[in-house]
Amino acid sequence: MTYQKLNVNTYSNLQIFNMPDLIEIQRASFRWFLEYGLIEELDSYSPITDYTGKLELHFIAKNYKLKQPKYSVEESKRRDSSYAVQMYVPTRLINKETGEIKEQEVFIGDLPLMTDRGTFIINGAERVIVNQIVRSPGVYYKSETDKSGRRTYNASLIPNRGAWLKFETDKNDLVWVRIDKTRKLSAQVLLKALGLGDSEIFDSLRHPDYFQKTIEKEGQYGEEEALLELYRKLRPGEPPTIAGGEQLLHSRFFDQKRYDLGQVGRYKLNNKLRLNLPNTVRVLTKEDILASIDYLINLEYDIGQTDDIDHLGNRRVRSVGELLQNQIRVGLNRLERIIRERMTVSESETLTPTSLVNPKPLVAAIKEFFGSSQLSQFMDQTNPLAELTHKRRISALGPGGLTRERAGFAVRDIHPSHYGRICPIETPEGPNAGLIGSLANHAKVNSYGFIETPYYPVENGRVLRDRTPIYMTADAEDDLRVAPGDIMTDAEGKILGDVVPVRYRQDFTTTNPQQVDYVAVSPVQVVSVATSLIPFLEHDDANRALMGSNMQRQAVPLLNPDRPLVGTGLEPQAARDSGMVVVTRTDGEVSYVDSTKISVIDKEGNQADYPLCKYQRSNQDTCLNQRPLVFEGDQVVAGQVLADGSSTEGAELALGQNVLVAYMPWEGYNYEDAILISERLVYDDVYTSIHIEKFEIEARQTKLGPEEITREIPNVGEDGLRNLDEQGIIRVGAWVQSGDILVGKVTPKGESDQPPEEKLLRAIFGEKARDVRDNSLRVPNGEKGRIVDVRVFTREKGDELPPGANMVVRVYVAQKRKIQVGDKVAGRHGNKGIISRILPIEDMPYLPDGTPIDVVLNPLGVPSRMNVGQIFECLLGWAGEILSVRFKCVPFDEMHGPEKSRETVHLMLKLARDNSGKDWVFDEKHPGKIWVFDGRTGERFDRPVTVGIAYMLKLVHLVDDKIHARSTGPYSLVTQQPLGGKAQQGGQRFGEMEVWALEAFGAAYTLQELLTVKSDDMQGRNEALNAIVKGKAIPRPGTPESFKVLMRELQSLCLDIAAHKVETVDDGTTQDVEVDLMADLPGKRTPSRPIYESLSTEGNQD
């Protein structure tokens, strides 16, 4: 079946509000960092004075410079270096005594630059900085019930950095304060210590009589007494002083270096407490403290409201720029200490700014952030969608955030304020559920870090779609009635119907159209990019939609991408914003095209070259490849797509293939979600993907001399070297299989490495046998493929190598993987399964016109999982296949009328039947079902079957990467049991429960073998191997090593444990004898080597 689809029929009369650039969040944040964040940080540390105050070092931050990066993006990837710029800051050193001023530009460190795709290249690997969602600084009020059942309130003042301040009331109507979670002291003490008199305190409170109780209970404090009391509480055990108290209070809350509310904190405080302090006041003031106590007391009188900490108005997003700024602060902190020390130690005449400023602490801080922070992640590059989603991810984990163990249900749960901001569907399954989310489609992050979402205004029940949408934060929309994007309107935008569902004050209710204030701009505004690529999403259960969203990110790019027959209309934007397709920057004419570059000449006659990426390896070992879409002489406009990337076709995202599916059981081969497929999918390379793996070896300098990359490898015949060049490196284009040598390497070997026979030869003849050992890079078990690239890096060529390495060789092996039994495939609706059998085409069920089915799915996978969207997709795809059209259906289509999905699908199927003249395509009696014939017998099945075209993806969980076997292999040092896992060439663990199963069956000998000779009886297993090689009977097992370890552990606890056996003596009496369980322990710790004697000599002796 060939699918030549040309005309696209978009069924949806919705003019979607254009989606913003999807990775704007990354770019805008980094731009902010370069323009403001870095300058702000440097300014906050300038000037740095020494302890005497004689010397001052000023950073003139606004004039900082970035030098050109050393290598381009491509070159950085090739050389395993970072794509970074050097930062230079003009500095001024002022000597107060002599009045001398020295100015210099000082290097302060390397700053990794963001590529235009929103990623960073660190040591040759693309990384993404994930956005973090944290509690916003500000003041939070909470009500609690104490032991006596009385409601009390507390207020927490949380800064960006610095000490927390917590006020609380108790059952006796007293007001207390805690500083940084220490012991509580009376609020009066804090206020008096700030130098406030009774009159000032009472004037600023709405209910001064409430606070009067606190003063009466505690008695009056003067300012000095209060300071002493404060010092006693915060520093118990030290003699209190008034100066000490003042200094303590000032440094905790009023010192800019130690306490910072941040712009956000100030904004939130002003909003909540109705203050008018300027944005520049980033420390606490007396007004803040008084106002927060006032609000707290008002709560006791039911004035004001408590805060919900999971509300998105109280959580903010920290993107790259801010996370990097925080890290630079850490570096500058260390730098400041170093500068102070140097100022004190050195002679002031000889000092220059360059000698003072050491870039190391800043470089280390930046390196640590990009290299090992929890939020700096290896980019998921499986396909363009995975890449895009990774950059829009929002995590509550990481430094300053939550931890998995401590996060409860409330934090993970969907909150009404998530609407249009964070996707309620896309989140991982497992321990991170709800802690990691994805930004919704139209969401933006504002300058304070709060997520905003756009709405159209509504006047008198009419939606003003011609106006610019208004972006709103979560707290701005709390008191408004907001309707969803899929309500029915007429051509003028008037809302139809009498009842409209709205969100109002964190609640989902209904109202009449006149009361509606705003309407969402699009039905897919609620969900993320991946979720909005699922057609008929509204017919799927949320759990399955979640799996569908997550599995689209795991789809492997296929050899011949095929865009879906049934899509949602967001595919082009997802492809374009992922950065995988090549987009023109100017209008013009294509002057040159080949597979590696496209040139465009603009109106002014300037030529722009667009290089294409050919068969590059991605982070996940999939293949990145671009193919031109334009021809020489074509006219192009700015923003037009010139070339497709991997998993895109015709500038649209194409993650899978359109295949003919039938929902029917077939001989039990699709039991429990297994999937039966036709051989056509193998022969026609429908699901064939290319995977490129990288193998690396370095030649190091050892104590005994340098390692050598060479062809001269001991004990390897010419056959093993046939594909190596004269240097001993494999040639490009060679086909290799497991065990083949990729790079020959020999390592010098010391005296101790020599076997006894070699020592003997040397003793007799005094000659040196060639003392090197083979340490070559070989193809690992179960791998095969073709060499596509070889890169050699040496010191001589000026490459940067790891310390101790003289030469690094990198070999890239490409494999073509056809689909096979054991591979995982899935649809977009969370319907996943493993391929259980590949049937010959002639055995597959076929349609009345003889077309064989491609994939047979189990119908029982639908009802209990409630992902009915797959049925709609499958039938609409069937209509599209016959009519040769594609459909774009935006999810949530009931705004076009009730039951719209079903109506449309039926309409299109009827149209397909009438246009094709094949009556069997749509049967009114069983709509959507077709009589299907058994390919083996030619008989018709006993009932009609749902058949259609579904879009199925092949996922990255390939059986080739998982299959594994072990005969002999490495053992763990302590327990002497085989290691686990494919990477360690490990065994299959026969665990506690499996042992119970064998015990239940009484399979004693099998069990004994499993626990001894197949596992950790060291002597027994060597003897058993020997016996197997020689064809003898397997000897009796000994004591397992792990049992001996247990005995030793018990003995180390001073428990004398011994085993006794009862023996009968000659005179018929019995006595017990102690058995030494350690007896069979050989003298050496290492197991004796099995002795391989040839079987023939054995036979001759008999």
UniProtKB/Swiss-Prot annotation:
Its EC number is 2.7.7.6. SUPFAM superfamilies: beta and beta-prime subunits of DNA dependent RNA-polymerase (SSF64484). Keywords: DNA-directed RNA polymerase, Nucleotidyltransferase, Transcription, Transferase. Transmembrane segments: none annotated. GO terms for cellular component: DNA-directed RNA polymerase complex. It catalyses: RNA(n) + a ribonucleoside 5'-triphosphate = RNA(n+1) + diphosphate. The keyword Hydrolase does not apply. GO terms for molecular function: DNA binding; DNA-directed RNA polymerase activity; ribonucleoside binding. InterPro entries: DNA-dir_RNA_pol_bsu_ext_1_sf, DNA-dir_RNA_pol_bsu_external_1, DNA-dir_RNA_pol_su2, DNA-dir_RNAP_su2_dom, DNA-dir_RNAP_su2_hyb_sf, RNA_pol_bsu_bac, RNA_pol_bsu_CS, RNA_pol_bsu_protrusion. Residues 1081-1102 are annotated as: Disordered. It comes from the Bacteria. One of its GO terms (biological process) is DNA-templated transcription. NCBIfam families: PRK00405.1, rpoB. Belongs to the RNA polymerase beta chain family. DNA-dependent RNA polymerase catalyzes the transcription of DNA into RNA using the four ribonucleoside triphosphates as substrates. In cyanobacteria the RNAP catalytic core is composed of 2 alpha, 1 beta, 1 beta', 1 gamma and 1 omega subunit. When a sigma factor is associated with the core the holoenzyme is formed, which can initiate transcription. This is DNA-directed RNA polymerase subunit beta. It comes from Trichodesmium erythraeum (strain IMS101).
